[in-house]
Amino acid sequence: MNQLEQLRQFTTVVADTGDFQLMKQYTPQDATTNPSLILKAVQKPEYRHLLERAVQDHHGNGGVDAVMDEVLIAFGCEILAIVPGRVSTEVDARLSFDTTATVNKARHLIQLYEQRGIARERVLIKIASTWEGIRAAEILQRDGIRCNMTLLFSLVQAVACAEAGAQLISPFVGRIFDWYKKQAGEQWDAAANGGDNDPGVRSVRQIYDYYKKFGYPTEVMGASFRSTAQILSLAGCDLLTISPELLEQLAGGQGPVVHKLSVDQAQAANIARITADEPSFRWQLNEDAMATEKLAEGIRLFAADAVKLEKLIGEIAK
């Protein structure tokens, strides 16, 4: 068995891409998208028609906002024709500090999916793991709208999401790794910070262990990988969402895959509970320079790509 096949024995494999033609060969269970991945996909000739059709059908009726939503849903529906499970569709990052607007947008996206015959159980609404986003997820989950909490870089964010009843979280491995590597500069020791000691891997393992120790049902889906080594160090995580490039490397890899994360190990671990009410959340996040900076940066980057997509829509609509 190749490494991808071995990994599937321990973990649900998810494709992290808007390029739905490319994901077919890896037969993922679920798929995730984000504004950056959708922007990248619509710039390819083979997906241009989805953008043009959305502009043609909706620009005169609802403007750019309606077209943006239609593009997200169009990609989601195409992906759901390929994967047997769920697709993650992201709420505009510019709503990350507005609970009411996030709830309204999520409900609208689910309504659009349901109008196309897609059951809400097959859709995860991606929301940034700000305090306001987590409160939106709490409301949505009560409505039966499942949420995927993204841009998650710290244990306190993870605990707040679980206590809000979020369906799933996406802790970002690679971006955590990037931050620590950049901070270390020339002092970075690749060997000492690789494998199980990779700071991004350690963060996800800490969150996974906490959830399993205290019996939270929220799913943990490691995301944002820079290498297959990071992925294989998290074998056993509930889900891992992986880019096509890294899926290809795993499919070509022949080394053994070791089961790294397990419920039994987590439950046996000595872990202290933490408080994740609003004052504690804001303080602990503020104390974590990496998480604070990467959350802010991630929101800015996703928002910038949403603006680029709007400009692209405007050019086509002329």
Curated annotation (Swiss-Prot):
Pathway: Carbohydrate degradation; pentose phosphate pathway; D-glyceraldehyde 3-phosphate and beta-D-fructose 6-phosphate from D-ribose 5-phosphate and D-xylulose 5-phosphate (non-oxidative stage): step 2/3. InterPro entries: Aldolase_TIM (IPR013785), TAL/FSA (IPR001585), Transaldolase_1 (IPR004730), Transaldolase_AS (IPR018225). Keywords: Cytoplasm, Pentose shunt, Schiff base, Transferase. Its main location: cytoplasm. One of its GO terms (cellular component) is cytoplasm. The keyword Cytoplasm applies. NCBIfam families: PRK12346.1, talAB. Belongs to the transaldolase family. Type 1 subfamily. Homodimer. Transaldolase is important for the balance of metabolites in the pentose-phosphate pathway. This is Transaldolase.
